[in-house]
UniProtKB/Swiss-Prot annotation:
GO terms for cellular component: plasma membrane. It is a multi-pass membrane protein. Signal peptide: none annotated. The chain crosses the membrane at residues 41-61, 72-92, 103-123, 127-147. This is CDP-archaeol synthase. One of its GO terms (biological process) is glycerophospholipid biosynthetic process. It catalyses: 2,3-bis-O-(geranylgeranyl)-sn-glycerol 1-phosphate + CTP + H(+) = CDP-2,3-bis-O-(geranylgeranyl)-sn-glycerol + diphosphate. The gene is carS. It comes from Methanoregula boonei (strain DSM 21154 / JCM 14090 / 6A8). One of its GO terms (molecular function) is CDP-2,3-bis-(O-geranylgeranyl)-sn-glycerol synthase activity.
C-alpha cells in the first residue's frame, strides 16, 4: 500500500497551478472539485507513488524481502487510484456543500484506499486478490486512519496544510 499512501502528501507539497476542473462549476453551481486538486499535484503525486513502488520492487528483488510482490502495473494503479479516490471524495463533498479542508471523518481517511482498491480490482484483479488477503485488509483498515492523521498533523505543523485533519 505504500505506493497508495505517498501520492496525497506529495500532491499537497508540490500542488498548485491549474485546477483539474479548470475552475468550472457543476450543474448545482458548486465547483466540480475545487482549487485543491491540480494537475501538478496529480502528476507529482502519481510519479512519487510509482517511484516508491519501483524502489519496493527493487528492494524485494535485491534483498529477497518477504513483502508482497509488486509490479509496475500494480504500483501505478495504487498511486493513481489513491488520488482518483481523493478526487471522487472531493466531488461528493462539493455536492454535499462541504468546503475545501472541511473535515469529513471516515471518508477523509479511506478515500485513498477505496480509489486504489477499485482501480486495481478493475485493471489487475489477479494481483489484487493474490495480495490483499483478509489479514492484509484488516492491517490496512487499522493503519490507514492512524497514518492519515499523523501525516496531516505533520503537514499542518510544516504549514503545507491549513487544517490538521
Amino acid at each position: 500500500m505504500v505506493p497508495a499512501y505517498i501520492p496525497n502528501p506529495v500532491a499537497a507539497l508540490c500542488g498548485g497551478g491549474t485546477p483539474i476542473d479548470f475552475c468550472r462549476n457543476y450543474t448545482d453551481g458548486r465547483r466540480i472539485l475545487g482549487n485543491g486538486k491540480t494537475y501538478r499535484g496529480l502528476i507529482c503525486g502519481v510519479l512519487a507513488g510509482v517511484l516508491i513502488g519501483l524502489v519496493q520492487i527493487w528492494l524485494v528483488g535485491t534483498y529477497h524481502w518477504d513483502l508482497p510482490r509488486q509490479t509496475i502495473l500494480s504500483v501505478t494503479l495504487l498511486a493513481l487510484g489513491a488520488l482518483l479516490g481523493d478526487m471522487g471524495k472531493s466531488f461528493i463533498k462539493r455536492r454535499l456543500g462541504k468546503e475545501r479542508g472541511e473535515a469529513w471523518p471516515v471518508a477523509d481517511q479511506y478515500d485513498l484506499v477505496v480509489g486504489a482498491f477499485l482501480l486495481t480490482i478493475i485493471f489487475d484483479p489477479a494481483w489484487f486478490f493474490a495480495v490483499v488477503t483478509l489479514p492484509v485488509l484488516i492491517a490496512i483498515l487499522v493503519i490507514t486512519p492512524v497514518l492519515h492523521r499523523s501525516v496531516n498533523i505533520l503537514g499542518y505543523w510544516i504549514k503545507v496544510k491549513k487544517e490538521p485533519w
